[in-house]
Amino acid sequence: MAGEITHQSPEDIENELVRRGHVVTSWDSIGEITIEATGVETSSYRIGLPSLESSPTVFKAYFPPDCRIEAHTHACDYSEIILEGTQKVSGKWLYPGDIRIGLANRGYGPLIAGPEGVTVLVIFADGHWPAVTIGAGDGSTLGTGELLDRFSAAGEN
């Protein structure tokens, strides 16, 4: 039936990739979670086989207006693209079309969504994307546990 959304788990995607060599999906089919502490809404998928830690990881995330995420880092290189809205990162305002490129283990932040919120696409070089706290941050705004529960590699749950 046209328009009907079918949920695709990482395992479903992996099985189809192995069988056919490619898969067509959507953000709606992948599904999203909302981080309780911040209201951030996010979805994720892996480029390549979801079970491989070496597969690049893509997140699409919406940060509500004025949402603040503490300074942190990641254990892999990444890039963030501002799709809609504005975001202040380490004191610099970013706008739609801006691209931020970051190296592993180099801290940044805080991230503060603009008054209209912000939607971003973040591409991590591999599966080592979970945020790592730095400085005085306690991790409460990162939602790492919730993200790992939902978006860890296929077969790890």
Q: PLM features: what roles do these ranges have?
A:
Residues 93-96, 104-134:
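Ligand-binding loop in jelly-roll beta-barrel domains
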Residues 1-54, 138, 148-157:
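A short, N-terminal "cap"/entry segment at the start of jelly-roll beta-barrel domains
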Residues 38-48, 53-73, 93-96, 103-107:
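Conserved short histidine dyad/triad with adjacent acidic residue
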Residues 91, 110-112, 150-154:
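Short, charged low-complexity intrinsically disordered segments located at boundaries
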Residues 130, 143-150:
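Long terminal segments
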Residues 61-64, 73-88, 93, 123-125:
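Short, conserved beta-strand element in jelly-roll/cupin
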Residues 76-78, 135-144:
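Short intrinsically disordered coil segments
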Residues 68-78, 113-116:
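Short, surface-exposed loop and linker segments with low hydrophobicity and enrichment for Pro/Ser/Thr
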